[in-house]
């Protein structure tokens, strides 16, 4: 289909809101086919679209989210979850020019969004790819601050999500990032931690 009409690679989605049961992500007006493929971790389609001229940094939807943001999102307790495919999709986008530092309308980078949705493997990969662990979103939170809070995303409270949260916190600590790190309001990572098990991890 792309060989017959290369313009499909850059065509914008027109429906106000689209939800596909096989892809656990909302798609909005202004998104491209690459957003849809990235959200579903369809790495083979991502490669094909990029080779056909799709822009890895396109962000014309109302949330100013690029395909890399969608690939960084996840629902780890959902039926379509696949951590390996997620990382492969992120790698493909970054290798073709996806900006790991790009912020959406809320100031969230792909790393913020991977942390928020408890995608531990994606967090580790994005950090290795140059993601900034101390970048602040518009609320002033760094990815490390989000790691110690209940974000209401990624199956929060479920055993798999809690274990992923532990892994993410360990990853930040292994990089030597201090729990004393302040957010935009001057609050430390430790000060944002409410659960005792998280506080114990931060002081260990």
Please place each PLM-identified region on the residue numbering:
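Eukaryotic tandem repeat interaction scaffolds
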Residues: 86, 99-139
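Leucine-rich solenoid repeat scaffolds
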Residues: 173, 178-204
């Amino acid at each position: 289909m792309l060989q017959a009409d290369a313009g499909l690679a850059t065509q914008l989605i027109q429906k106000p809101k689209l939800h596909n049961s096989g892809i656990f992500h909302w798609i909005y007006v202004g998104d491209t086919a690459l957003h849809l493929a990235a959200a579903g971790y369809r790495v083979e389609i991502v490669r094909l679209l990029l080779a056909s001229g799709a822009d890895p940094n396109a962000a014309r939807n109302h949330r100013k989210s690029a395909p890399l943001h969608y690939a960084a999102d996840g629902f780890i307790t959902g039926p379509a979850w696949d951590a390996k495919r997620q990382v492969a999709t992120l790698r493909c986008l970054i290798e073709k020019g996806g900006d790991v530092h790009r912020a959406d309308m809320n100031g969230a980078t792909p790393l913020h969004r991977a942390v928020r949705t408890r995608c531990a493997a994606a967090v580790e990969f994005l950090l290795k790819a140059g993601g900034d662990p101390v970048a602040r979103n518009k609320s002033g939170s760094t990815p490390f601050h989000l790691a110690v809070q209940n974000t209401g995303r990624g199956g929060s409270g479920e055993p798999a999500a809690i274990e992923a949260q532990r892994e993410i916190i360990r990853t930040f600590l292994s990089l030597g990032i201090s729990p004393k790190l302040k957010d935009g309001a001057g609050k430390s990572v430790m000060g944002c931690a409410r659960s005792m098990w998280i506080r114990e991890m931060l002081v260990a």
